[in-house]
Amino acid sequence: MKKSIFFLLLTTLFFGFSPLECQAQEGAILLEKDHSLHSNFHKFALSRINTINRNFLHTPENMFIEGNGSVYVGRYHKVDHSSVVVEVKQINSNTAPFIGVIQYVESVFESNGQCNISAAEGPFNPVRHRKVTEIFRYVQNRWQ
């Protein structure tokens, strides 16, 4: 019970509206893809995905390679731009009239080889996926 009250308070302070307020607004208006705010959020989302890909600890340029002498594994993380889905919704809030939702898939790619060089050269195959959803609010003419 204390965790749910804390979560409600935290989200109310951070986003300017409570999750209960969002749930009450099931009739939130989904903006069309040709709306200028939607295209603005789409650019923001792609920039965010580029930042996420750049900030992974293990990237295609800096992959993790481990081995036990006979088999080596090269591994890195990446968000595929084709997995990105964005939505912009108009809500009834004075502080944040719009929210943007980004959904994407983080994938872990691995390659096996007989030495660290062959493991680093690939071919790489996706071995794990994680679906991520991020919610942003539009305040003072920018996405936060």
Predicted segments with their positions:
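Bacterial N-terminal signal peptides that target proteins for export
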Residues: 1-9
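N-terminal leader/assembly segments
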Residues: 2-3, 19-25
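Generic structural motif
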Residues: 4, 107-109, 139-141
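Small/flexible residues
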Residues: 4-5, 77-80, 132
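Bacterial N-terminal signal peptides
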Residues: 8-16
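Flexible low-complexity loop/turn motifs enriched in small/helix-breaking residues
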Residues: 22-117, 121-122, 126-128
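Short beta-strand edge/turn micro-motifs at domain boundaries
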Residues: 129-144
